[in-house]
Amino acid sequence: MRDPKVIQAEIAKLEAELEDVKYHEAKTRSAVHILKNLGWTWTRQTGWKKPEVTKLSHKVFDKDTMTHIKAGDWVKVDMGVVGGYGYVRSVSGKYAQVSYITGVTPRGAIVADKTNMIHTGFLTVVSYEEIVKSR
């Protein structure tokens, strides 16, 4: 039969080892949360995968019109109910004259002759490729 002091010593040793394991698991969980928040993904086949780097778009701010939108830009109009893609004809202050795009052909975009004055807060500059993909 084993001595109670030896059993208590083994129990203390196992409890200390258990605390070390809990501490290590907590650090591992924290690291996993940090990686997921940074956009990393994990699968069984590939393991951890670094997120793809997205291009940053730099907007040139015009101090005269107080907006980054300028004539000749392709824009996305989003006013809640009304929306779509358009072409900026001119900018005056915080308003832009926009012609809506009615269609896209292999030769280019079909832009309406009619223009609408739209507040620049409802406009987002987009690439022509995005307009083609949306059609």
UniProtKB/Swiss-Prot annotation:
It comes from the Viruses. This is Protein 4.7.
